[in-house]
Amino acid sequence: MEMSNAQRLILSNQYKLMSQLDPENAEKYQRFQTIVERGYELQMRELNKDYGCITEALCKEIIDVMEMYHAMQESFRMLDADESTQVDQRRLQFLGFDIASEAQLVHYVRFLTESEGLYPQFDKGDHHFNSQMPMLEKYRRMLATWRKCPRQYHLCATELRQIFNA
């Protein structure tokens, strides 16, 4: 994150104010203030990770992933008893993304489900959409398989298994 001296001064002052307004987190804000004032670029990346940007294309892709899970869940509900026994129900749960390596994606999913009220049927579980392992590439393979299905919202057990195994 490159900043001019003026931007660093403004941000430093913001952190100083935050440390005074939020005494419980004062130590954290003072640390951020020191990082910004002294221009420690390695640590400034840490500050940037919370303020990064997700492209419009990636936002749409995340929504597509969530829509795919919605379609799989609805398809499962329409299966007859014989077919439903061929599908591992646990794999129908949308796990989210890895907070360690895909934090912005986790935050976006939380924004969509909490602030925007989308996909209320998704169980956020104990981990609140933190899959605890990188998932984006897996979801991309699943999306590619799902998009090849002729009836994306009326999938059979075989198609569901193919998507899971992508």
Swiss-Prot record:
The cross-references to Gene3D superfamilies, in alphabetical order and at most eight, read:
Helix hairpin bin, yfbu gene product, domain 2
Could you name the domain of life of the organism this protein comes from? Bacteria
Stated family: Belongs to the UPF0304 family.
| Protein name, as recorded | UPF0304 protein VV2347
Please report the organism this UniProt entry assigns to the protein: Vibrio vulnificus (strain YJ016)
